[in-house]
């Protein structure tokens, strides 16, 4: 094969580029004025994070790969607005393989060899993948697993997100089983507060997480939360 074969060069490019893509997270840490401007843009829907989201979901739609946005961007679209510095996507194992085969080296690089995640070479933002059939939190088998995105996604402005019940279930299961993921339980509490979720909302959740939802709901009630809405 010729040394200048374009396909060969393309396949080598992720390893070459991985160390040269500026890190969005590092820039946030080291450039406070830029970080403040970026945070302001985020809450207007105009940040590099949202640009990265639109870019990757547009590519997945073009390739026909099912996905659902999770993490902080899903929280944002459902009504709890907090800043996030990465893009989290739920995909199937087949979808993940296709993503790496078709996108790695073409605007995206792996942060390190063998990583299932990618970094957008334009923004430096990490795109993290959750995979259908795997388990949230400690990663061990449990009654709540990452579902097929095609069955749980809701669309807003042309982008598919985890539906609210699924988002809450996964965050509860994560926070319940991994002490390092207590932020997920805090996110659920903020959703309860921001959306005025009723305790009846818990009925549509998996039994494995239902009691934890009710516990968090009661904590909000005791701290002054009032149940004045049915979501």
Cite the ranges covered by each PLM segment.
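Compositionally biased terminal segments of proteins
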Residues: 2-231
């Amino acid at each position: 094969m010729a040394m200048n074969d374009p396909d060969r060069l393309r396949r080598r490019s992720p390893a070459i580029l991985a160390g040269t893509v500026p890190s969005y997270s590092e820039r946030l840490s080291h450039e406070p004025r830029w970080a403040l401007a970026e945070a302001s843009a985020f809450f207007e829907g105009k940040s590099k994070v949202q640009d990265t989201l639109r870019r990757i979901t547009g590519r997945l739609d073009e390739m026909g790969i099912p996905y659902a946005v999770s993490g902080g961007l899903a929280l944002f679209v459902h009504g709890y607005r907090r800043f996030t510095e990465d893009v989290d996507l739920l995909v199937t194992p087949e979808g993940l393989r296709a993503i790496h085969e078709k996108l790695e080296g073409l605007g995206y690089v792996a942060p390190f060899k063998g990583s299932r995640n990618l970094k957008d070479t334009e923004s430096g933002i990490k795109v993290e993948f959750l995979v259908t059939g795997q388990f949230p939190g400690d990663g061990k088998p449990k009654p709540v697993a990452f579902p097929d995105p095609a069955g749980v996604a809701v669309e807003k402005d042309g982008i598919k997100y985890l539906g609210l019940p699924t988002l809450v279930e996964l965050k509860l299961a994560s926070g319940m089983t991994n002490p390092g993921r207590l932020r997920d339980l805090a996110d659920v509490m903020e959703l309860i507060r921001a959306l005025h979720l009723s305790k009846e909302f818990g009925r549509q959740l998996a039994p494995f997480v239902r009691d934890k939802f009710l516990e968090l709901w009661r904590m909000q009630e005791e701290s002054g939360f009032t149940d004045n809405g049915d979501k």
